[in-house]
Regions:
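Catalytic-loop signature of eukaryotic-like protein kinases
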Residues: 138, 156, 173
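Active-site-proximal glycine-rich helix-loop-beta segment
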Residues: 92, 161-162
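Glycine-centered loop/turn positions within well-structured domains
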Residues: 104, 163, 167, 171-173, ...
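Flexible, glycine/small-residue-enriched loop-and-beta-strand segment within the central core
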Residues: 4, 15-151
Length: 235
């Protein structure tokens, strides 16, 4: 299977697997696009890894980001130095892992870590990306949300539109607001435990395809137990 790169795009030091597509006016450097992965118009990627069937819509800006299979983003997505799991649904105008400014120092200005202003000689005074930023699997992030550095969003969580996430989010928890606060759990604790145990997002694609009706059911303990059975058989 061949890949496609629009003639207007620049792709350097990058591996494209079969079926991957890079659309108009993109700039991709030192990255890897998995089988069937898509990158929309006017996107810029550097040191990124996209899993199988990952879909990045137009005007994305991504640096040192790893995205799992089947995860997709909306327009104007930005990410820095972060890891995003499988089967995530990320809406438009979402920002993940933006740099921190250390407000405990005399100044928060970027000349402490950027040579662009001509005031820094030598190495940056601190690493603005030192705190990890991790998004789990099957996470839904609504439009205009911001996930700050140092935050881990657990599997199955939901981040409401416009939320600013400054603290860790537990698995299968819905958060909203500025700053984001827990609203409720998506399911009862036993169903959540079973879904996490199942690791269904690691199942082979064909197994998921063959069981779409199961995955479309309302989540409860019985449905989760059936997912567990699939995982025990195929993982």
């Amino acid at each position: 299977m061949t890949y496609y790169i629009d003639p207007s795009s620049t792709v350097k030091d990058t591996k494209l697997c079969g079926g991957a597509k890079v659309y108009k006016n993109c700039n991709i450097i030192s990255s890897r696009l998995g089988e069937g992965a898509l990158v929309g118009d006017f996107s810029r990627l550097s040191d990124c890894t996209l899993g199988e069937k990952a879909s990045i819509q137009r005007y994305a800006l991504m640096f040192n980001t790893k995205i799992g299979r089947y995860t997709y983003t909306g327009r104007n997505f930005t990410s820095w130095h972060c890891e995003i799991g499988k089967f995530c649904s990320i809406s438009w105008n979402v920002s993940i892992g933006g740099a921190n400014h250390d407000y405990s120092r005399i100044t928060t200005h970027a000349f402490l870590y950027s040579a662009d202003f001509g005031l820094l000689d030598g190495e940056p005074e601190y690493n603005r990306f030192s705190d990890a930023c991790i998004i789990g699997n099957d996470v839904w992030i609504g439009c205009g949300a911001t996930v700050c550095r140092g935050v881990t969003v657990g599997d199955g969580a939901v981040v409401a539109a416009g939320a600013v996430v400054t603290k860790n989010v537990e698995p299968y928890t819905i958060v909203a607001g500025v700053p984001a606060k827990p609203i409720k759990k998506r399911f009862d604790e036993e169903t959540i435990r079973l879904l996490i145990k199942s690791r269904w997002w690691d199942l082979p694609s064909q197994v998921i395809k063959d069981n779409v009706k199961l995955f479309s059911q309302k989540a409860d303990k019985n449905a989760a137990k059936k997912i567990i059975e699939l995982s025990e058989k195929h993982l």
